[in-house]
Amino acid sequence: SAPLAAYLRERGEILMVSGFTDDRPMRGGGGNARFADNWELSAQRALTVTRALVDEGIPSAQVFAAAFGAEQAVASNADAEGRARNRRVEMAPMPRPARRAQP
């Protein structure tokens, strides 16, 4: 995590951790009832990785979580293999937002 933190700091970037799901709707009871829908599940995926990075020493100001639900599929959801590929977390460096001047 130290090399990642140094990389982000040197480049003036922050890390976006994005969570995704397949297109199967969440079902109460039979499926994973902890999440209301795919948006919530994808948010939890991203937050789990974000928290692990912070626990490993990445400053919390250098990382954020984003949820995409079933949007932006990388494979067809028509079969189990494609759905498995769509259930993922991605990480990408992003430009750090400009700081606003204090009034």
Task: Give the role of each language-model region.
Residues 16:
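Histidine/lysine/aspartate-rich catalytic loop segments that bind and position anionic ligands
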Residues 1-3, 7-10, 20-103:
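Periplasmic OmpA-like peptidoglycan-binding domain that tethers envelope proteins to the cell wall
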Residues 13:
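Short beta-strand/loop motifs in extracellular/secreted proteins, especially
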